[in-house]
Amino acid sequence: MDKRLLDILVCPLCKSQLHLDANKQELICKADRLAYPIRDDVPVTLVDEARSLSADEIA
């Protein structure tokens, strides 16, 4: 993912910075414990598309 794009993307719920998990192709919001998918190199930052993360996945 382009670093410039990653620098401007934020969580739609809390506006926190998102962190890339390149292995899982997801953008992670640690504050809300959500993972937003990246499909075909396009980040899908819709809350309905996000999956909840466990505390272990955040660490």
Swiss-Prot record:
Superkingdom assignment: Bacteria
Gene Ontology CC annotations of this record: cytosol
Pfam families: Trm112p
Gene3D superfamilies per the UniProt record, alphabetical: 2.20.25.10
Similarity comment: family membership: Belongs to the UPF0434 family.
Name assigned to this protein: UPF0434 protein Pnec_0311
